[in-house]
Each structure stands twice: as structure tokens, then as C-alpha cells.
Amino acid sequence: MQVSVESTSALERRMTVGVPVERIETEVNKRLQQTARRAKVPGFRPGKVPMSVIRQRYEDAARQEALGDLIQATFYEAVVEQKLNPAGAPAVEPKSFEKGKDLEYVATFEVFPEFEVTGFDSIAIERLQADVADSDVDNMLDILRKQNTRFEAVERAAENGDQLNIDFVGKIDGEAFAGGSAKGTQLVLGSGRMIPGFEDALVGVKAGEERVINPTFPEDYQNLDLAGKTAEFAVTVNSVSAPQLPELNDEFFALFGIKEGGLEGFRAEVRKNMERELRQAIKSKVKNQVMDGLLAANPVEVPKALIGNEVNRLRVQAVQQFGGNIKPDQLPAELFEEQAKRRVVLGLIVAEVVKQFDLKPDEARVRELIEEMASAYQEPEQVVAWYYKNDQQMNEVRSVVLEEQVVDTVLQKANVTDKAVSYEDAVKPAEAPKAD
């Protein structure tokens, strides 16, 4: 087999492969012999058909099959021989395909980039330091109580924070419009759910009252037919209800699965969850900075095939997440290209760090991560056992741990500054990383 390789760009290779006619004929004959054993030809017993008849009837098909299989087999033999690492399937162009002659074809494909990850000392990391204070737990209890607010009917004028049950009919220039009317709508005043001016105009109403209000749709309203127009809404108030925060008692604690320990036990459980959230938030922000730093220090050209594959994965995820009667390939590729490129580049960089530093998943950390995830469930021991019985889930956890070890490796070499902040600042969502 003869092989020659031409570099047509930084990552594209044009490989010419020549396959001797003897190898072709061996493969063709092998297939004809297999066919002869099972072929049914009128006038002959199975397995007794003369080879001349077999050739006449089946040689063309056997040759096409043999050539296709040989191209696939010799391509992989050639890339191994040439020490190439294809990043996707090749585009194959036959050059010589005649019977009785050598097969020659050209395979064009991209290869994975070869590079070394550098610039660790140029990466600046701000690592947040925070604790869960008693006041943070108090604030969380207030949030949990507000999330479980109940509304009770009152015989007074409505205030911000009250919940109204209303019917309304909206018109513009005396004409009703789509979506402008509803019955039995629950509306919390001050929630910002309705267009500006709607909720403010209902402050002070009482149950049974009818009121006409005239709010204006914003100029940037999504329905362009309504944008910037003033509407008239005839509103009937069916009821006014005031918010009632639940008491911190056993009934409230039971909503969160806490059946014993009283307030002290509930606070301890809330604190434990907050501490877990804090650790995860700090870890996530450090990881984002590490990845951004690796990207900035290591500009890597990536194969278009890998970006295309990642774009397709993101399309499928988008359809699964948002639903709708749409096929993934109907979503414009450009919507996902920047995110896809970032993922591909980071995947290559992380894999190279693993290779450079000979990293392997720390099984103790794998166990620790599984136990931490399991602690959020009612029966953590069962969750841990489930992970260890599921190879796919275990591999995913090991991948997460290996990525954490990459982050730790970078932190040992980067410029790290610790910064003390409040719990609230530490758990604020990090800004989305910029796509490179």
C-alpha cells in the first residue's frame, strides 16, 4: 500500500492511498466464494454453482462491496502508519477504480491540533472566601416563608403585595384586542406581571368594585400592534386578599421534609444546604475563571468538523429544552457557533492538561462527590448505591472529578488571590463566560 500526505491547511490533510490490485482481487474472490455457498441459481444445486456463473452474476456487486470495505480499512491503516489523528470522517475521492488495476483514492480530512498548554502563570484567579452567618440563615428563613405565602381575603382597600382576583376587558380605540380580556385572574399588586401602570392603578380598590384604567403599552412591547398604544381596561375586582406568612412551626418544617428537631433542627438543615450551595458557587466561579484563563493563554485552531458536531448537539439540546414542533437542523447554526467553539476548544485544552500532567480520576474524590450529591435526597445511601451500579453515571462523575483536578492543577500554577465576601455576594450567579 502506497501512502502520501499533503498538508493543505493548518489542520486539513489530503492523503493519497494506493491499494495493490492483488489485495483487491483477494477481497473480491473471498466475497464470491461466500456468495457461491449460498447462491440459488436455476439448474444448479445450492453450493454447486460453477464459479464462472457466480462471477457472471455477482462479480460487479462483490467488487463494489470489496472496494468500499477496502477504502474504509486502508484509510485507517494509512492514518495509523502516518501517525495522523483524524477529527472527523474523510471526504473520499476515487482516482483509479478500474478492474485489473490498482485502486487509488484521495481522502481529505481534518486532524486534531497538536499543542502544549502553556501560560499558567499568566492566569489571574480571584477566589472568594465566605461563611454562612446566622443572619444569612435568618434571611433564608424569610425567603422560604415568603415563597410559601398564603393569601386570606380581607375587607379593606388593596395595597401593594395584596393579591386580587379580577376580571378585565381591554380595548384600544373602542375595539377589543387579542389577549386583552380574562376572567378570574390572580394578580399580586407590585409583582410587575402586567404592563406598566396596570397594577399601580388598582392600588386602593376593594372587593366588588369596578374600575376603568388606562395604562400604555411599552414602546418595545413584543406585540408590535400594541406597542406604544394606550388601552382602556374595565376591571372588576372579585376579591382582595392579604399575604399571610406561615409561622415557623412543625407544620411549616414538614413542608421541607423536617419532621423532628423543631426550629433548631430546621435551621441546621437550612444551614447545611446553604453551605453546600456556597461551596458549589465558589467552585463554579473559580472554574469559570480558570477556563477563561486557559482560553486566553492558549489560542487553539480547532477542526470545523468538531464545531459542526457540537453545533448539532446544541441544536438537539435546545429543541429538547424548549420543545416546539421544530427539527434541530431548522435552527440556524450561527446561533450556536460561538458556544460550540468555546466548548470544543476547552475540551481539547482540558484533555491536553490531563495528558501533560498524567491526571487520573481520584476515586476518593469520586466517592466524596457522589455522597455530597446524595445528601440532598431523602435516602442518600440508596442514591450512592444506585451510582455505583450505573457505569454511565459513574463515568460522568469521574469526568467531573477529573475536570476538578484540572482546575486544581491550574490553581497551583496560576496567580490566585483570596477575597473575603458575604454569603450573598458569593452565591450570586456568575456572569456568563464570553465565547471566544
From Swiss-Prot:
Enzyme Commission number(s) from the entry: 5.2.1.8
SUPFAM superfamilies from the UniProt entry: FKBP-like, Triger factor/SurA peptide-binding domain-like, Trigger factor ribosome-binding domain
Example GO BP: protein unfolding
Record InterPro entries: PPIase_dom_sf, PPIase_FKBP_dom, Trig_fac, Trigger_fac_C, Trigger_fac_C_sf, Trigger_fac_ribosome-bd_bac, Trigger_fac_ribosome-bd_sf, Trigger_fact/SurA_dom_sf
Record comment regarding domains: Consists of 3 domains; the N-terminus binds the ribosome, the middle domain has PPIase activity, while the C-terminus has intrinsic chaperone activity on its own.
Its job: Involved in protein export. Acts as a chaperone by maintaining the newly synthesized protein in an open conformation. Functions as a peptidyl-prolyl cis-trans isomerase.
Protein name (Swiss-Prot/TrEMBL): Trigger factor
The organism of origin for this protein: Ectopseudomonas mendocina (strain ymp) (Pseudomonas mendocina)
Gene: tig
